[in-house]
UniProtKB/Swiss-Prot annotation:
Pathway in which the depicted protein is active: Amino-acid biosynthesis; L-arginine biosynthesis; N(2)-acetyl-L-ornithine from L-glutamate: step 2/4
EC number: 2.7.2.8
Native organism: Roseobacter denitrificans (strain ATCC 33942 / OCh 114) (Erythrobacter sp. (strain OCh 114))
Name of the protein described by the UniProt record: Acetylglutamate kinase
Lineage: Bacteria, Pseudomonadati, Pseudomonadota, Alphaproteobacteria, Rhodobacterales
Site (Transition state stabilizer): K35, K244
InterPro entries to which the protein is assigned, alphabetical: AceGlu_kinase-like_sf (IPR036393), AcgluKinase_fam (IPR004662), ArgB (IPR037528), Asp/Glu/Uridylate_kinase (IPR001048), Glu/AcGlu_kinase (IPR001057), NAGK-C (IPR041727)
Length: 287
């Protein structure tokens, strides 16, 4: 039996869709690169909700490209296999044994979990890594850190071919150098490099914080590149936020129109950012 409360819910839903029309039109045909952090993956229910959002984006004409992390899953597997980690200045050294685990977890467990979730919601996702089709060519970041790489070149042809055919690429952040040696790449860095190569309309960095905050702890909804640089210089932006804002700035310099840092644990975070007036998190634009 239908009730008035149910009718009100449907009216509210219809109103929300109506208000979203300008944004749906705005992003039709746009490429949006989404970095899905390991801490944002959470439960199977959260993964399914993220997958539904991605499938909806594809359904309304957006071209989503996903780059994922997997730090917590890598740590869990290293512990399970009793592989001890060495750290240099707080950064993990990726030796050969660790690199084998990293590739297994990222390309296998994590990547295929995301692909399965998207396909389970009616999408058509394809799981790859930066090694496929020489997507990401990298170099060693620091010999002291072992097999950790920095992107030197991104060849976006495979991604363009996939998105033109309405596939959803899901990329594990691995790359190889000119000799074929595999390297682990920071997920944020990989996402920024991919977004720049695609000249993406948006780079969405899904993390476990609500966005960039000021001294009072308030989330700043819109910032310029210069404001980010000033806040980093005076210490307002510090700690784990620095790599994310650095990725955002590098992406902007590479031709991405805007980057957004937002809480990937929040329900429908990507949809709120793209298709509502107020968005979600902190959007950073070039000066």
């Amino acid at each position: 039996m239908k009730t008035q409360d149910m009718n009100r819910d449907w009216i509210s839903t219809a109103s929300t869709l109506n208000k979203a029309l300008p944004y749906l039109q705005r992003y039709a045909g746009a490429t949006v690169v989404i970095k899905l952090g390991g801490h944002s993956m959470g439960s199977d229910e959260a993964m399914d909700e993220f997958a539904r959002d991605v499938v909806l984006m594809r359904q309304v004409g957006v071209n989503p490209v996903i780059v994922h992390g997997g730090g917590p899953m890598i740590n869990a597997m290293l512990d399970k296999l009793d592989i001890k980690s060495e750290f240099v200045n707080g950064k993990r050294v990726t030796d050969r044994a660790t690199m084998d685990v990293v590739e297994m977890v990222l390309s296998g467990l994590v990547n295929k979990r995301i692909v399965q979730a998207i396909n389970g919601q009616g999408g058509c996702a394809v799981g790859i890594s930066g090694k496929d089709a020489r997507l990401i060519t990298c170099c060693q970041t620091d010999p002291d850190l072992g097999f950790v790489g920095t992107p030197q070149d991104v060849d976006p042809r495979l991604l363009r071919d996939l998105t033109e055919k309405e596939y959803i690429p899901v990329i594990a952040p691995l790359g190889a150098d000119q000799t074929g040696q595999t390297y682990n790449i920071n997920g944020d860095t990989a996402a920024g490099a991919v977004a720049a190569a695609l000249k993406a309309d948006r780079l969405l960095l899904l993390t476990d914080v609500a966005g960039v905050k000021n001294d009072a702890g308030d989330v700043l909804t819109e910032l310029s590149a210069k404001q980010i640089e000033d806040m980093t210089r005076d210490g307002t932006i510090a700690g784990g936020m620095i790599p994310k804002t650095e990725t955002a700035l590098a992406a902007l310099r590479g031709g991405v129109r805007a980057a957004v840092i937002l809480d990937g644990r929040a329900p429908n975070a990507c949809l709120l950012e793209l298709f509502t007036e107020h968005g979600a998190g902190s959007i950073i634009r070039a000066d």
